[in-house]
């Protein structure tokens, strides 16, 4: 044999030598022979993913701003690693994130940081994604979400009551909104909630588990083993990787218990739950005979549940917190919103609907600005056109090339949103009056056939949550600045420069 007569040190040296030769050959290929070799961008970024690894892992999720610098130097299209391109052009966003008329796959790096391989959001191939999405789409339509509004109002009643009880004290609005969104989304998925709003200081294990996953997001994208392999390691080993990682396992076990509780119910009770007006997604999916058996496996249902729940908690809670920060930070905006909402004031015992609130121009402007400045997913989510070459700015992008844009860069593009860092609801009011379709550039929920599944549920929580909290409670900011809601790191979601980015407020009492 070739290495039979080599000593162990010599064999190790030979292995390292072979690896070094491979690395050199790969670098030469990436720079001089790769199909993307002629695209603009720094040469160091074109070599494998070393440059991206440095900024996202070593420098804690800051590659986004390095990409921004690349665009400033090289133009609207740049090569950001050996096989991927990034474009900054708000007009081209819908071409990359295409609708159902063109087949678009998701690139592996977009999901390799997640630990839910059987979920719709982690599905790479276009046709399988379309089938999985079709199963749950009906339960996230506007009509379906309208049936959930009574639950949203009931949870808001409890939230506002708890905040009012804190009169004279400081509350963490971000945690409070997180508990609210968690209750709503778990109810919609499982048909029940755990009353996270009732938890001490609005803190609960599910949110802690999400934080653990997000803190590991950038690293797991580059690991040579799937994240699920790590998640399935024994708890003592997981504890060594991250002392809080067992929280993730505990959260999955809690979700598993909820699924198994349903499976153990008598058929008559399952049928009654299926026929209920506000049925949960998982119950309906399990009960629907049209759903293939392979889409009803326990792992599939757990992964689907966890992604919908995790995605629906943090992004909406952050958006609510961003909205309240700007309202409390600018009393003129808050007073104008309250005045506008007085035009559709309800008598005792009646509540606003999302549709009614959407029809109030200034209310809509507040919601859209909060969404714009909360950004949604700030990480790149590359798309692949598997069979069709894309054309952009004189370049032909080969089929199979991962291409992405950044919601953060689009939402801060001054050519679309002048003074982009200013919270200005009037920009949406004026755009509507002028006949300008500013919604075309609202990309926080992404676009196309893979746009956010829960967009209608998110809007319902935002409209109802902002309107009711802003008109019910008298509060003032406490030790919270713009830096606390700013984006300085990307770990799947947006993270501040330091701390947890919480918006804190002192409760003065109920509005008179």
From Swiss-Prot:
The keyword Transmembrane applies. One of its GO terms (cellular component) is membrane. Belongs to the cytochrome P450 family. It is a single-pass membrane protein. Cytochrome P450 monooxygenase; part of the gene cluster that mediates the biosynthesis of the sesquiterpenoid aspterric acid (AA), an inhibitor of dihydroxy-acid dehydratase (DHAD) effective as an herbicide. PbrB catalyzes the second step within the pathway and converts (-)-daucane produced by the terpene cyclase pbrA into an alpha-epoxy carboxylate intermediate which is further converted into the tricyclic aspterric acid by the cytochrome P450 monooxygenase pbrC. It is an enzyme of class 1 (oxidoreductase). The lineage of its organism: Eukaryota, Fungi, Dikarya, Ascomycota, Pezizomycotina. Its EC number is 1.-.-.-. The chain crosses the membrane at residues 6-29. It comes from the Eukaryota. The fungal sesquiterpenoid aspterric acid (AA) is a submicromolar inhibitor of dihydroxy-acid dehydratase (DHAD) in plants and is effective as an herbicide in spray applications. This is Cytochrome P450 monooxygenase pbrB. Its main location: membrane. Its cofactor is heme. The gene is pbrB. Pfam families: p450 (PF00067).
């Amino acid at each position: 044999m070739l290495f039979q007569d080599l000593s162990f040190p010599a064999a190790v040296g030979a292995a390292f030598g072979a690896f070094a030769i491979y690395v050199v050959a790969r670098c030469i290929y990436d720079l001089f022979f790769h199909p993307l070799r002629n695209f603009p961008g720094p040469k160091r970024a074109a070599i494998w993913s070393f440059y991206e690894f440095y900024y996202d892992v070593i420098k804690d999720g800051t590659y986004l701003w390095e990409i921004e610098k690349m665009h400033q130097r090289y133009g609207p299209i740049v090569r950001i690693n050996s096989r991927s391109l990034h474009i900054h052009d708000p007009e081209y966003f819908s071409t990359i994130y295409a609708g159902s008329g063109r087949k678009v796959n998701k690139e592996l790096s977009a999901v390799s940081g997640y630990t839910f391989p059987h979920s719709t959001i982690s599905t790479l191939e276009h046709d399988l994604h379309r089938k999985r999405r079709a199963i749950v789409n009906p339960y996230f339509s506007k009509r379906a979400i309208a049936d959930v509004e009574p639950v949203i109002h009931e949870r808001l009643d409890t939230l506002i009551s708890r905040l009012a009880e804190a009169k004279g004290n400081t509350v963490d609005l971000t945690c409070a909104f997180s508990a609210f969104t968690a209750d709503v989304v778990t109810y919609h998925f499982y048909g029940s909630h755990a009353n996270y709003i009732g938890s001490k200081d609005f803190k609960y294990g599910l949110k802690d588990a999400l934080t653990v996953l997000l803190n590991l997001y950038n690293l797991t994208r580059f690991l040579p083993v799937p994240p699920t392999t790590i998640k399935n390691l024994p708890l003592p080993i997981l504890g060594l990787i991250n002392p809080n990682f067992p929280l993730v396992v505990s959260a999955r076990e809690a979700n598993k218990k909820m699924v198994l509780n349903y499976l153990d119910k008598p058929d008559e009770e399952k049928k009654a739950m299926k026929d209920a007006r506000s049925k949960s997604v998982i119950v309906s999916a399990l009960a629907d005979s049209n759903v293939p058996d392979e889409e009803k496996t326990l792992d599939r249902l757990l992964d689907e549940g966890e992604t919908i729940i995790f995605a629906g908690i943090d992004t909406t809670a952050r958006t609510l917190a961003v909205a309240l920060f700007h309202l409390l930070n600018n009393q003129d905006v808050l007073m104008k919103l309250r005045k506008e909402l007085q035009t559709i004031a309800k008598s005792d015992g009646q509540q606003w609907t999302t549709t009614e609130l959407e029809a109030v121009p200034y209310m809509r402007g507040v919601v859209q600005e909060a969404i714009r400045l909360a950004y949604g997913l700030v990480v790149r989510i590359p798309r692949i056109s598997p069979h069709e070459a894309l054309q952009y700015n004189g370049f032909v992008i080969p089929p199979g090339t991962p291409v992405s844009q950044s919601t953060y860069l689009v939402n801060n593009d001054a050519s679309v949103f002048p003074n982009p860092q200013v919270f200005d609801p009037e920009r949406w009011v004026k755009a509507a009056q002028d006949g300008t379709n500013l919604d075309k550039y609202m990309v926080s929920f992404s676009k196309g056939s893979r746009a956010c599944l829960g967009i209608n549920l998110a809007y319902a929580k935002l409209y109802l949550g902002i309107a009711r909290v802003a008109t019910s409670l008298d509060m003032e900011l406490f030790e919270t600045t713009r830096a606390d809601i700013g984006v300085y790191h990307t770990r799947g979601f947006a993270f501040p420069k330091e701390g947890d980015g919480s918006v804190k407020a002192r409760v003065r009492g109920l509005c008179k």
